[in-house]
């Protein structure tokens, strides 16, 4: 198995300047809720607004949702660019 991209969490950011605004209240990484497919991203680009995170990890799940990692995207096209510095495990 190879190294996976770091896990995205509540408050992590995107290349659109947005922020992940919902995440698990049960599963955490570094003490911060893990973002899953369907959690929400708030994008500051006019017309984008709040959209769900639509791509997810390679089968890894939290709360029944695919885990979001750096490189995954929101419905508005934003790419997640920050995540846990210690979660790049396989």
Regions found by a protein language model. Give the residues of each.
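Intrinsically disordered, low-complexity proline/glycine-rich segments
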Residues: 1-90
């Amino acid at each position: 198995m190879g190294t996976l991209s770091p896990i995205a969490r509540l408050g992590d950011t995107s290349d659109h300047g947005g922020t992940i605004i919902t995440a698990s209240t049960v599963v955490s990484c570094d003490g911060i809720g893990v973002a899953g497919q369907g959690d929400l991203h708030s994008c500051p680009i006019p017309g984008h607004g709040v959209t769900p995170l639509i791509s997810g990890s390679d089968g890894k799940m939290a709360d029944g949702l695919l885990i979001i990692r750096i490189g995954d995207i929101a419905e508005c096209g934003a790419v997640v660019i920050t995540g846990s510095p210690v979660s790049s495990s396989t």
